Amino acid sequence: MNILIQGGGRGIGMALAQRALAAGATRLFITARDPLAAPAYDMLAPDDRVTFLPLDVTDEASIMATGARIAGAVPQLDRVICTAGMLQQGDIRPEKRVADLKQDNLLHLYRVNALGPVLLARELWPLLKGDHRLHFAAISARVGSISDNRLGGWYAYRASKAALNQLMRTLSVELAR
């Protein structure tokens, strides 16, 4: 089984990578912005089934390069799990009021949380289609639910996760064709 874990260098992604190896993954691709600095690197790199790849989900050229590297290594992917995501970093913080919105922050969260996974799917398309059973998952958040928003706030994060949910639903429809 060939598996890609986008954002597998730490946290949830690292735990999923460990589980994938324990379950017998044949090839495991793990992406991180800086793989050598990722906590998972020292733990998982010695396993010859593991390949760490640099990936900046906000950079389309990086997404394309990662897709090309994986396509050059395996004929198909059986599992893709996108765990990279962001709520806050630096001056990007969850907004409490609409007056707190900043366009650059909103766009950055869209790039990380919503666009990264679907652009990666675009680059991996030949490895996703075919006669094999594929599972493509992206970690979202309950706050991405439109119907469950009773508290307000967190505009950029909520919107980016809602966009991710719609993009993944649309991708699933196309993959089923």
Regions found by a protein language model. Give the residues of each.
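N-terminal Rossmann NAD(P)H-binding glycine-rich loop of SDR-like oxidoreductase domains
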Residues: 9-18
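Conserved N-terminal Rossmann-fold NAD(P)-binding element of oxidoreductases
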Residues: 3-8
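Rossmann-fold cofactor-recognition segment
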Residues: 44-61
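Catalytic loop of short-chain dehydrogenase/reductase
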Residues: 86-114, 129-177
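Conserved Rossmann-fold cofactor-binding substructure of NAD(P)-dependent oxidoreductases
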Residues: 57-76
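Conserved glycine-rich Rossmann-like NAD(P)H-binding loop of the short-chain dehydrogenase/reductase
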Residues: 21-40
